[in-house]
Amino acid sequence: MQIPKPNNSTWTDDQWEAIVSEGQDILVAAAAGSGKTAVLVERLIRKMTRPEHPVDVDRLLVVTFTNASAAEMKHRITEALEKELAKNPGSLHMRRQLSLMNRANISTLHSFCLQVLRTFYYEIDLDPGFRLADQTEGELLGDEVLDELFEDEYKAGKPSFFELVDRYTSDRHDLDLQWLVKRIYDFSRSHPSPEQWMRAFLSLYDVDAQTKVEELPFYPYIKEDLSLVLRSCQELLERALSLSKEPGGPAPRAENFIDDLEQVNELIRHQDDFEKLYELLPNVNFKRLKTCKGDEYDPVLLEKATDARNQAKKQLEKLKDEYFMRSPAQHLKSLAEMKPIVETLVELVIQFGERFERAKQEKSIVDFSDLEHYCLRILAEQDAEGHLIETEAAKYYQQQFEEVLVDEYQDTNLVQETILKLVSKGEHSSEGNLFMVGDVKQSIYRFRLAEPMLFLNKYKHFQPDGKETGKRIDLNKNFRSRSDVLDSTNFLFKQLMGETVGEIEYDEQAELKLGASYPESKDTTTEMLLVHLDQQEAETGEEREELETVQFEARIIAKKIKELVEQPFQVYDAKQQMTRNLQYRDIVILLRSMPWAPQMMEELKKQGIPVYANLSSGYFEATEVSVILSLLKVIDNPYQDIPLAAVLRSPLVHLDENELALIRTSDKKGTYYDAVKAFMSVTHSDHPTCKKLERFFQLLRKWRDFSINHSVAELIWEVYRDTQYLDYVGGMPGGKQRQANLRALYDRAKQYEKAAFRGLFRFLRFIERMQERGDDLGAAKTFSETEDVVRMMTIHSSKGLEFPVVFTVGLGRNFNMMDLNQSYLLDKELGFGSKYIHPELRISYATLPLVAMKKKMRKELLSEELRVLYVALTRAKEKLFLVGSVKNQVKALSKWQNAATGEEWLLPDFERYQSKTYLDFIGPALIRHQAMSSVLEETGDVVLSHPSTFTISFTQASDLLKEDMSLEKKEQDEIVQALMDGLPVEGYGDADEKVAERLSWKYPYLAASQVGTKQSVSEIKRMKEIQDEYSVPSSIRKARATLYDRPAFMKKKTLTAAEQGTAMHTVMQHIPLPSEEPYDESRIGHLLDSLQQRDLLTDEQVQSINQEGIAAFFSTSIGQKLLKADWVKREVSFSMVLPVKEVYSHIDTEGEPVLIQGMIDCLFETDGKLYLLDYKTDRVQGRYTGGIDAAVPILKKRYETQIALYAKAVERLTNRTLEEKILYFFDGNVEISL
């Protein structure tokens, strides 16, 4: 019977139920900010302090995710016990609980496993004096074992091993295969029975002549993907058809859409039959679209319908490429061929595991993975069928623990789940005692092999009433955030999180409910800040400064932070129960990962925003550390060019770049060490460079001898002493930190040798391993929580934290999906999927298991990214900012509108499955919010009714460039202004003359500085036009006929002139030449159809092609020569170096070169004569008042520089003289010989 909640209790009913319920396994689904830690602590305290049957604290097992969480929980419990003791000082029970706290089993699961090993080591013949190895030590030992294993296999000479090597290694080394063995071994350790799991995945390749693809274990994931894509194509084509029936829609194309839709429906009817799909899909043919020209067709509807059809077409093409490039029989044959290869691989991994374990036992060490697996061996044995049978040790813990409580249960893996079951009573008792707390929506550690499905399966199986199952309790009241934050989060995730993508429905139970009480505020609306990056030239023609996306976002964040602080924004202090002004420390900036952090910090600091981020990297890049590491590499092996050059250039030897170059001239082909020896042998000993080298090599010989009989740590200290380098760096800026860095390297060498490793080479390999993993020896920066600065951290680091104001940034960055592109994948359920690799032909392609895993893992990755986004949004207490960048505002809004179809709350599965960024998730969801009316010309078809409030704004990147808010810039402006006003500048003394001299100084090579060292021919042409009388705007306007633009509302959306030009060049590039047959409009039309089928041209580009102009070109004299050419080369790229004066006659600089790059449209030879042809799509007809005759001299002058440079390049390349250089303008069929 449940204990009733006291009348004066502040706990909610659901929280109270979680505190007092018992008698069965309990799962508490605790949403963000629902007070789960407080509930867990209260449950523990009540168990220890209840009047009847109190529980001693050492009879409870509490498993936390981190050591910090365990320490915090111990502290909270101790405080609560002390308060209880203060109320009743005579309580012996309270005193006993406090005395037992040092024995309390409140720890991470790894710590508990370590305790089990210390207690029952004898059950598995483990050395009681074992120690825990760090990760790097374990990896080095594993590398040694693997090297020995491969050496033995090579000696044994088994054909199966050599075939494995042939398929999974490069021509140069077998490191790829070694890495694969380690990868499978490490991955298998997340399964309770690694060997059993590896042998099980061989069933993926267990096929014969009677096997059907549909029968294989991975097929359900292929079937799901096929269904997802085909349904998406169906929806897209139905949308296109619907648009064609609207007023102004592309009605003639309805016939196309109906035909396309019928083909897709036929595929859907057979989507469960892989063989039938293989027959049907290659025959799907989207015919050429009907022409829709004229003002009666709405260009917007036309574009939307065409885009929908093109999307469907591309999806079907991708489906064909992924699954149906080979017949089902060929796919099965590939799997059958791979089975013996995979069997050999599995046996190799098992051998490695056995040898690795023996090697660790010999050294009496265990690694973190061993802790769990050894604990599992102590708690359970396997029977003949692989089932786990609990041991006496497991029964001991079942009797020992009254209850097992697990925090952050959503982040456990299968091994940990098995251990928890073995020490709890749930499997063998009607009164389960496993209490699990977590939130699957915050499961963000799949990359560490956490398994959120464990939580989800229980969530679906357990019931709120607990009858015949475990009990499920939902804590969905949020006591952290204002309603604006909760409503915004709910609005987004009701549309984004579902079973297919998200792995859980964001239903009423999952929604966040308001639990916190805040005073009213008008400024807490969630803000979406978007940067429009499309950087076109300003109207003035001046090119804008190029800034990276991170800098743009940093500037918009800085602007907002300044506004918040200057207003000032009011935040509520719950402890003081009062509102106060916002401080910098109330703000956090959350990033998905830290690569952006250094640049963002730098930009924010420039804008005057105090900011802190724990950038715990850069130790190995520190100059003083990299110099010593390079020196150690040279001591180990001087035949390493880069380390040797680094040491010679460093303060240890002090050679400059000229001396290094001089040394290389002594031996240009050998190693740099050979060059040094050669230089010293031919150079007089009194030469300054030779003296430096001689001193260094005397020390080097000494150190190499010293390293033979001494430890690495002793060698490092000897180097410090001989070079006095430790003292030297102490005198540099930041000297104390530099000395500390060098001492840390010495200390690490001592630790390395304590682990029974020896030798300089192995130590250097050990350091390389640390660098590869991103480990860092640098101490974390000391930082006070009270320091008034903006925090910057990853979303993962923010989990469990809360801040009044949160900026979630970088929402336009692509998700990291690199792992999905590997040649093989590993999955807990499906096992091992690999490309098929033919050893002789050296061809490879994805097998069906690999494709199935890729699809499965993509959905899992996207689900994880959704959960990461949920964590980010739920950190905010009072105000939330979402910050991202798009390349083009119009295209982004159009894309989001197309994705936000249907009236269901949940966005279509396929649209969410296609997401590559957080904006791909958020954009379509926000499109359906009423707030989007502020940025849309017309709102979408569906606007969802919801209490959430958003403000959405786009900022042009150009505006952020104009607002250079840098403090340094402001200071410079102030100084310049003071000088212009004749006012004294503080801090500069009587330096009037020097200031005047500097301000009046002119750079003598100004003209040369305006020319880049590398330029394209087009850039040179534009530079010439600036000085060209024919290109002065006023002159052009005089020559051109007056044309009037249509009003904007009458314009159709068409391809730009540049896009039309690109399309025309694509056609001319792919016309078969030379040709005996003439090119008329009919033949050109067939060519366009072919180019469209091959996706080289879009429908819009085909419509824009001047077919009549191309046909007319081939009837000209130059066109005829081209048809009869001996050979034709098109799109000929070149690079050549010319003196700058030869390109720009107004620049007097002698000897300065400029690298010129360009692309020649067409070069051909006819009757032994060489011709250069450049075709243009410029508008000519009707543009010049004097007609074509007036246009020719202007066009000649405009393009003469370009053609002259092309001619010079051709003559250099071929060593021949051009017969003729021709410009051809398709508009007007104008041929100009230059």
UniProtKB/Swiss-Prot annotation:
Organism from which the protein derives: Bacillus pumilus (strain SAFR-032)
Q: How does it assemble?
A: Heterodimer of AddA and AddB/RexB.
According to the UniProt record, one GO cellular component term is:
cytosol
As for what it does, the entry says: The heterodimer acts as both an ATP-dependent DNA helicase and an ATP-dependent, dual-direction single-stranded exonuclease. Recognizes the chi site generating a DNA molecule suitable for the initiation of homologous recombination. The AddA nuclease domain is required for chi fragment generation; this subunit has the helicase and 3' -> 5' nuclease activities.
Q: What is this protein called?
A: ATP-dependent helicase/nuclease subunit A
Source domain of life is: Bacteria
Catalysed reaction equations from the record? Couples ATP hydrolysis with the unwinding of duplex DNA by translocating in the 3'-5' direction; ATP + H2O = ADP + phosphate + H(+)
Keyword Nuclease found? yes
